[in-house]
Amino acid sequence: MKKLLSLVIIVVGIIADQVFKNWVVANIQLGDTKKIWPDVLSLTYIKNDGAAWSSFSGQQWFFLVLTPIVLIVALWFLWKKMGQNWYFAGLTLIIAGALGNFIDRVRQGFVVDMFQTEFMDFPIFNIADILLSVGFVVLFIAILTDKETK
């Protein structure tokens, strides 16, 4: 049952990410901004050929090699730790986010980013980035609370 739940979460995460990215591309000009919540959140369409803070900009080969490795390792750990809820949640979200951005990189050579925080200076990000970030936080909690690793 957990395998099916993991698959559903991954598929829903990827679909949400891809549908929203396509909506942004169709409705916002590259570089333009639409205010969503004044002084809090805007949608700004950018093409990101790197990672957060534009690190590794222009290094698509790096992501095209690294992402499948991360996915294989995450899937292996997910299989091994399926019964542990924190690992299950974290790894499932990481896989969904990694696949969401990987699809963009393979299809377009860049990732579509759109969420811009207005209240602090932070890189523009997308749904896949949210899934990855939350997944890594949850995985970190899993590792810290895992009795086997202590």
From Swiss-Prot:
GO cellular component: plasma membrane
Biological process, per Gene Ontology: proteolysis
InterPro entries according to UniProt: Peptidase_A8 (IPR001872)
Enzyme Commission number(s) of this protein: 3.4.23.36
Catalytic activity: Release of signal peptides from bacterial membrane prolipoproteins. Hydrolyzes -Xaa-Yaa-Zaa-|-(S,diacylglyceryl)Cys-, in which Xaa is hydrophobic (preferably Leu), and Yaa (Ala or Ser) and Zaa (Gly or Ala) have small, neutral side chains
Keyword Hydrolase in annotation: yes
Gene Ontology MF terms in the entry: aspartic-type endopeptidase activity
Pathway(s) annotated for this protein in UniProt: Protein modification; lipoprotein biosynthesis (signal peptide cleavage)
Sorted UniProt keywords: Aspartyl protease, Cell membrane, Hydrolase, Membrane, Protease, Transmembrane, Transmembrane helix
Cell compartments where the protein resides: Cell membrane
Membrane topology: Multi-pass membrane protein
Transmembrane segments: 5-25, 59-79, 83-103, 124-144
Active-site residue list: D113, D129
Cell membrane listed as a keyword: yes
Coiled-coil regions listed in the entry: none
EC category name: hydrolase
HAMAP family the record matches: LspA
NCBIfam families: lspA (TIGR00077)
Role this protein plays: This protein specifically catalyzes the removal of signal peptides from prolipoproteins.
PANTHER family: LIPOPROTEIN SIGNAL PEPTIDASE
Family that this chain belongs to: Belongs to the peptidase A8 family.
Protein name: Lipoprotein signal peptidase
